[in-house]
Amino acid sequence: ISLLNRLESEGFSDEVYGLFKKSLETLAQLHIKGDEGLDYNNCLTNKEFGKQAIMADLLYFKYYFLDALRKPYDKQKLIDDFEALSNYLTHTEYKYFMFRDFQSRNIMVRNNEPFFIDYQGGMKGAPQYDVASMLWQARANLPDEWKNSLLEDYMNAFENIIGQAI
C-alpha cells in the first residue's frame, strides 16, 4: 500500500504524519549516501538536473495547471520567477542524488516502514526539488502546518548527516 493510500484512508493522523516524517528522513540519507560513488553516466535520462530540465518542469506546470485554470496572471513575471528559481536550483552547492518524482504515491509502506519505488528519473540535482515534490504534491494536499514541520524535520535530518547547518 502506498503512503498516499494511507493518507487517503486514514487522513491527517499522527501515524500518517510519522510516515511522512520517516520518509523524508530516509530521503535525506538517500540523497547524501546514495550520491556517494554513484556513476551518473548510467542515468536513464540526464546525468544532472540542469536548467533546461527545470524549466521544462516549470513550463509543464504552467501549461497544465495555471493555463488550465483560465485565470489571469502576469505571464512575464511568472517566467521571470521560473528563471530565478531555475538559476537558484542549478547553482546550489548541495547537489546529490535526486529522485525527481518523490511523491507519496511512490512510497510503499510495509510494517510502518517506507520503501521507495520509481527511480528511473533519478539523477544528480538539488535535494530541495524532491522535498518540494513531496510537500506540495497536489493529491496529498498537505496542511501548511504539516509542510512547515516536515520541512524542518527534513532539514534537521540532512544537517545531522552532513554535520553542519544548511
Predicted regions and their residues:
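ATP-binding pocket architecture of kinase catalytic cores
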Residues: I1-A56, D67
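Short charge-dense sequence patches
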Residues: L7-S13, A28-D39, F97-M108, N156-I166
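Flexible, glycine- and charge-enriched loops at secondary-structure boundaries
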Residues: S13-F20, K75, A140, D144
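Alpha-helix N-cap/helix-start motif at coil-to-helix transitions, marked by capping-box chemistry
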Residues: K21, Q52-L59, G122-G125, E145-N148
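Alpha-helical elements of Rossmann-like donor-binding domains used by nucleotide-donor carbohydrate transfer enzymes
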Residues: K22, T26-Q29, Y60, A84, ...
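Active-site acidic catalytic loop and adjacent metal/ATP-binding pocket
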Residues: L27-H31, A84-V131, A138-L142
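An alpha-helical support segment within catalytic cores of ATP-dependent transferases
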Residues: D35-K47, Q52-A53, D57-F97, E159-A165
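Active-site activation/catalytic loop segments of kinase-like enzymes and analogous catalytic loops
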Residues: L59-A68, P127-Q164
